[in-house]
UniProtKB/Swiss-Prot annotation:
Major subcellular site: cytoplasm
F-BAR domain residues: 16-269
Residue span of region Disordered: 353-472, 489-602
Modified residues (Phosphothreonine): 531
Basic and acidic residues biased stretches: 410-422
Protein name, UniProt field: Septation protein imp2
Biased composition (Low complexity): 357-377
Single Gene Ontology MF annotation: phosphatidylserine binding
InterPro entries: AH/BAR_dom_sf (IPR027267), F_BAR (IPR031160), FCH_dom (IPR001060), SH3-like_dom_sf (IPR036028), SH3_domain (IPR001452)
Amino acid sequence: MSQQLSFNASSAKPDKSFSNYFWGANDEGYHALLSRFSDVKHINEELRSFYHERANIEEDYAKRMAKLSRTTFSSLETGCLKESVQVMKAEVDNMAKSHLQISQLLQDDVENAFTRYAASLKDKKKMIVSGIEKVHKDKLSKHQALVKAQDKYHYLCKKVNYYVSQQNMLFGKELEKNNAKLNKTQNAITASSSDYQSAVAAVRDSYARWTNEWRSTCDKLQDIEEERRHFLKSVMWTFTLLISRSCFNDDQACERIRKNLEQCSVSQDVLEFIDAKSTGTGIPQPPKFYDYYKGEVPDDSVELVQANFQRAQTKIENDNMPLNRPYVLSATARNESSFENTLPNTPSAIQSLTTVSSNSSQNGRSSPKKSFLSKFKLTSRPSTPNVGNTAPDALSSPRNDSPLTSAADEQMKHLSLQEEPKQNPTPAAPGAFPNSNTLPPRYNELGSLPSPNSVSFTEDSRPNVNTPSRRQQIQEEFGSVLQMENRAVSPVYDSRKNGSRSSFTLRKSRSPKRPSSSLSQNASRLPRSLTPGNLEPNYDFGVRVDPASGTAPTDDEPYTDRDSSFVDDTINTKATGNTSNRLSLPAYPTDGGDTSIDNPTSTDGQRILGYVSALYDYDAAIPEEISFRKGDTIAVLKLYEDGWWEGFVVGEDDHNRGQFPSNFVREIEV
């Protein structure tokens, strides 16, 4: 039987509720909402199983940690480190107890909550479903009786019409029989019509009752659904609070360990170890030659000489230097989601360490790498293709507005030789941070805190290039520094190879620029696992003056470091742009001597800037880096402004070169 739905066109769209949107000609809404109870039961059971397994994991973790805290280790340790080890064991035991308590709370407040809710839901279902099912069955039975009465009445009506149509076609006895049947059917149709009307009235009453009951049931079912969703939100919220409490308890335990370590003095421990375990200060001398032929007889005494050595000054700047080293994140940890983006407070241990590092820098301590860095120009990260040696006419001719030319003009303005003092940043110790309020680089890497404050400049911190002593120092120390890399021939210079060659070039690093974003999916462009401390400043060493030129550079504009590129060669004089007044850099040292000994190169001819020794082990996190072990000697080929250097391990294939953190090494003299 076809169903035709009629709506009042003037009525507005009903509100979104169960009582308005769960109807249907064949009771589709009734079946949809009642089947929801089965879905909810399945959902609750899945979540209960999940939290049950999570509580078991927490309990197993707590038991294993408690077992670990009862193990015996470092019994031979001495000094305050022995006390720190005991504190660590006690705090690990506290962590185990905390996690065991959390596992119990997960079982009581989370897992068992689903069991209690399932029992409550079962009672509600029994009460609601049983009532509406009776009404629904009564409606169905009345509707079936209506259909049966309707079919019977329809059949009798068809028979009456048939007998009436036969009256004009029959005669005699056949006509009499037809009329008798017609009278009998007419009597039956009267009773059938009465039954049919009664069935319609009964169905009308059952539909009215069904509409009221189902509307009320829809409201109750919607209340149950809303209550269920609030329950799930509450349970998941409780779960997160318990896990957060566990992490907070662990952090408090770690903070107590850190505070104990802050009180530990390595120097004092060493002195106490010497007092407790020293074996004497006498150095036994080698045995003498006894001439038995002359009657010399050795005695049993051992000749001792008092030891009075002076220990070489250590490179460690303070007793807490190992704590200043930033934690090296693994490649997996670097790519995980950064929940530390909104760190509320800096841990006290990190704050104290940054304060120590800043104080050491402010007290005049320069970086142990300063003597090494001050000899070379740091290479900034590239953002444009390499620009080779440009002919003088190209420099003096009008330029277009290309990005490369604009960058060169901008840098030439910053390096123009005018009579103004140039500012030089104060050098900072490796691993130190600009101020005590700045987190270590691993936190900056996550993007959670503002960038470090700019370092202060002093007006008289940079010596004037004009002074004769300064020019002589430049000529002696940095005569060939700017030719330290073998560059590919620039397209600009190649097209002008027959013209005069300018001594000043725009120098770019050929290494790809590392993106700061941690969302890159290219493994070779992942963010650094470690930013090696504060960026070393560009120590001012000026430019080399051509002895044939009588023009000396002046400092009129302050030097501004550029991240993308910088101009260390192409400089115009302040005067008129006359090419004859330009400074020129000799391609080779003025002494004319052989530089092959003083300037070692790699097998491919690239200049080796110096050598460093590894202080720690380091494993490469991305293909652009190299791995080395503590004590390895590394030849340095390039220096970058972000604190990463490029080189290779001496003794290995020098083609296997890559970048490494500069605060993992120290300078050595070769």
